[in-house]
């Protein structure tokens, strides 16, 4: 089993598989076509000794609540780490939700204005409606309309500010000026992603410890405090998500553990599936996976 275990899920041909793996050997411990915690617990207990389960000291896992139950039930001596990449993905998804919300509002407004404009007499159109349509389709200083700006800003919201190109910096300034909720959500996400960076001392990474965890937890609470009552729903969602999982998130600083090996294993599985032209027979597919990856 090893002292560290990774729990992740993989979608294959529309079916969800739970994969329990050993990051030290990059081998699969269990791969089963279910997400139900009770079935996963039963299968692992049926095939692995209690001594091996008790020897596990760390479990890195997906954010799904069923995996929390699996980890607590099977590995009582292990601390849990919410995978860093899943946490960051959840945060970025909420930032993108703000962008999508604004875009949907503008599309609705444009549709309603165009419908109202068509109903106006051609010789005496309503100047207010025409002006609003004109403003909506007006080009900004970078050549984008507001709708194009929202559409083309998807990529820059995934990046940190120091990673933006010159055109992305200009687009970001326009985006944040016109859509303040996106600015708030993005700034919040950047602060959280910087919080996740390993602290350095004299050019080297500080050794993970319980003291470091407590310091980082205090810093995280300071970051999210002002956002718990934000008027932006997506920002509140991020803050409450962090509060709900703060223990598992901060446990990252006990050993800098992530699910990176599980994600790499998923990619190897995907390549294996592609090389073998998909998975037509599930039982035979699982047998071949066991031969190659366990």
Give the predicted meaning of each segment.
Residues 4, 58, 79-82:
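Hydrophobic "anchor" residues on beta-strands that sit immediately upstream
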Residues 11, 36-37, 64-66, 87-89:
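Conserved nucleotide-binding/hydrolysis micro-motifs of P-loop NTPases
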